[in-house]
Amino acid sequence: MVFSDQTYSVLVVSSAQKFNDALTQMLPGSDYYPVNFVSNVAAARRELLGRVYDFVIINAPLPDEPGTRFAIDACSKTGTVVLLLIRSEVYDEINAKVASQGVFTLPKPIATQTLQQGLKWMASARERLRKLEQKATTIEEKMEEIRLVNRAKWILIEQLKMTEEEAHHHIEKQAMDRCVSRKELALGLIKTYT
């Protein structure tokens, strides 16, 4: 596997036991864990309510629906990469519908090597999504710090009659003097004065 330090969780939606057996051989536990199999879309939807998967692999069509709508819905979950395997006769039509939604597609029948390449593409896409998620988390944390510092400034302005500039300087200086983050200091000020 390309990203050997990562283990990917996989949900396989397929009613074809022969396909499931072949795919099991391609998903070693060292790279893919857990690997859960369900045979229809209803069970897959229930499974996605319970946990987030890195990969969802759909072997269409399924007994209860074609699988295209589910592929789009599963792809809209943050960080989930979806591969939809579809019959070659309808490949172009379905690919045109789902590719713009971020769903990877491959035509069936499929060679083992092609499927392995698809898994590598999925890993690459998942790692890119993981980096974007980390950036988003960092931005959210920064915004939370700014909100707390601003709230602490307003408390200092109201309680100690400081100007905004004085309150800002006070928070910066106290954080440096105490060797704590501005967020920690702001939380302490908020707790003290409210």
Report residues per predicted region.
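Conserved acidic segment of CheY-like receiver
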Residues: 6-18, 23-27, 56
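Conserved phosphotransfer microenvironments
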Residues: 20, 41-44, 54-76, 89-90
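Short hydrophobic/Thr-rich beta-strand motif most characteristic of the beta2 strand and flanking loop
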Residues: 33-40
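Alpha4 helix (beta4-alpha4-beta5 surface) of REC/receiver domains from two-component response regulators
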Residues: 68-69, 88-104
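A short, hydrophobic beta-strand element within the central beta-sheet of small alpha/beta folds
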Residues: 79-89
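C-terminal output helix
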Residues: 110-119
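The C-terminal output helix
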Residues: 120-134
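C-terminal output/effector regions of signal-responsive regulators
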Residues: 137-194
